[in-house]
Amino acid sequence: MSAPEMSKSKPANSHLSTGLDEAKLRAQVIEQSTREPSPTRAQLAVRHRVVLSIVMLVPLLIFIACGGIRVGPRPDGLVLQTALGSGILAAGLAILGVGRGRSMLGRPRSWLLLQVLLTPALLLGWRVLISACYPQMMVEWTDRPGLRCFTLSVILACAPLLGLLWLRRGSDPLYPRLTAAALGAAVGAGAWVLVDLWCPVGYVPHLLLGHVLPLLLLIATSALLGSRVIAVGRGSAPLTGR
């Protein structure tokens, strides 16, 4: 009878040991949290503004280094209309894609999906619509197929995209891929505005290769990174503050 009694006592000892380990771990976590207090929401807001300012300044400096605004053969009215229209669209899409709205869980899934789908369509449609109103503004440039615009679009978007993903790391419990895709669309829209000011070509195949394709790649890349970076439990989750 002693052998069975000994075998029955082993699970009890095992559960007791596990419980002690969990209690010890919990005590260590509580002790560490009290020793290293989390920053306040105001402090977090300041940090976020600093990071955003830096990552937004980088593409502007690159844009200036690459020549800045190049009117070229375009009429001033065309440049002004395309820049204003795409700028307003990019700002609205950024508010929709980057902002969380009233819910701490972020935008509804339908809003994010709509923003991702509409971003390339609206920006391309506006550029083509305005260019078509001016003669000779949609002709082919044989020496400008769109590769330089493609490269510039990607370079301009890198720093803002990485910065936004870092700020939103470990924060989305519902749709991390779609949220990240919306961030990529918002960043790509901002890069589109700068490239529009830099590029005088309105030829549709050029726009598809040099302007639309990098935007689509940014959206796809962001979606792939979403599950690894901004999903809850991935990476280092941002502190909520006090």
Region spans (language model):
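Disordered, charged N-terminal biogenesis/targeting segments of membrane/secreted proteins
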Residues: 1-44
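Non-cytosolic membrane-interface motifs at loop->transmembrane helix junctions
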Residues: 75-82, 111, 138-150, 178, ...
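Hydrophobic cores of alpha-helical transmembrane segments in multi-pass inner/ER membrane proteins
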Residues: 86-99, 154-163, 215-228
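Membrane-proximal helix-loop-helix units in multi-pass membrane proteins
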Residues: 124-178
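Hydrophobic alpha-helical transmembrane segments in multi-pass integral membrane proteins
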Residues: 124-134, 189-202, 227
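Hydrophobic alpha-helical membrane segments
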Residues: 156-159, 178-196
